[in-house]
């Protein structure tokens, strides 16, 4: 990935965020955040009181009320600034994507073939189902599927990756994205979306936050914050008659200051910024999430379904050996295996052709001159091969070949069964080759487990996350690789139906499941999973079924996605703990100052030794505003994340953010009080 990363406090973003923060002072914008709306209402009320005192309409200290009013406005402004800065970072990322969208013309074909007559039309007029021809140097005008041709495509504008990729008809690499550029050859593309619905349009909308809705956890936390605000509002309202009855009524300004300091303004002011920043961090990892709900779900995941190839292993399985059946010589097996692999463009297929050439000098045959029919691999048949003259050669998984042999009246030899087990026990993948109903032998495909993957799985296990390896290999091979990699469980000989059933089984147990996929056959399982990361190189069906798209098409990214989700939840929880713990210190500052004249016994609570009642109240209000500014970097970057169990994580957060939330305000309020006294403002 080479996408430019934004600095946390980019000067241009700071200026724009300040402007947006002022715009957000409107009551319509404030109403979306009930906690900060109360602060906004208090700011308006104290401003009106200040004006009334200045004009002599009511008695009171206009200077004290005015300063309190000013810092209440700063509190609202700082909360707006945090949200605007988070949104500004997202909008900056979106603007880089908007630069990809270019007004262009498209060659709309009148028939679905490359030599059909074409009409030049604006790309904006293309509709779902239209067929277009795109040549070298052209911008692909729409999202779609390649139905003819093959070409190298520059997707750097979307993925940030400079290396071109191959897109061709058929298979799992037929999906193309509007806004990318053809570097060579040509493609005939069937548009799969209408204008405004392209992947790029959806990316921009998601990144800008225009479609951001509150997640379930955000809603639950907002309800808690509203409940606390109502409780403190009622408690504060009852204090006026108590103080009046005592003969020294507390001023409205002091009551407003008390209310603002007691309600959870810190988390209330940063909550929206945390959610926006979580989406932004996900994009920083080159993953597009369809919603904050998907990011949040990633933090709650406790089961990871991981494809073996490319995620757990390096994914470049190579043919290492030909093991013939009894009565078959190795050259005959190698010749049949090479024939069955001539049209197989997978790394495994090409390695079989090369191994046969190296071992027995078997040259690749001219495919056209063979007049053969090639049988492609499918997830259902789990085998591929060739029909040539009267020969029917197949290679595939053990079970698939066994069914094929038995359906043709043959018998699966015991010695081949033993060879399959021997290969599987070594952690290699056995492919069986058959001609007609006669089993010729086994091809061994070796793969290598990625370095450090076992340690990563151990960390996930410590966090309470179960890892399940998904593979098309037989049980013996799967068990050997699972043991080497250190996963908790595995699903061998996996079919799309088996994946879907496994996800439903875990969900029935109340667990949240995450998985990756890139093919059309993965779409049902992706749609069922709670967190479904589709590969950008995959099919349109897979991308539509998932709730995230990995622009790097790296299956290992699923682990990073879970880390980002957990970091967002931890950030929200940690700052909530800090915010509520803050109230205790502010209680010790304001209560004695506000009511000591009525109830002198309350002076015992002035443990900080604050200079005067006015300086105590003002210090608490100033600290309440400034702490939001100091916590903005933490809200945007997220708290430090370490793979720990839930109980260990809770203890750690209580010590750091609970105890910190108690201690920091005592120190901060006292320092501000001393400064106010030195400046003669106390």
Swiss-Prot record:
Assembly mode: The system is composed of three essential subunits: KdpA, KdpB and KdpC.
Originating organism: Salmonella paratyphi B (strain ATCC BAA-1250 / SPB7)
Protein's recorded name: Potassium-transporting ATPase ATP-binding subunit
Pfam family, one: E1-E2_ATPase
Gene Ontology MF terms: ATP binding; ATP hydrolysis activity; magnesium ion binding; P-type potassium transmembrane transporter activity
Catalysis performed (reactions): K(+)(out) + ATP + H2O = K(+)(in) + ADP + phosphate + H(+)
Entry annotated with the keyword NAD: no
Keyword Nucleotide-binding assigned: yes
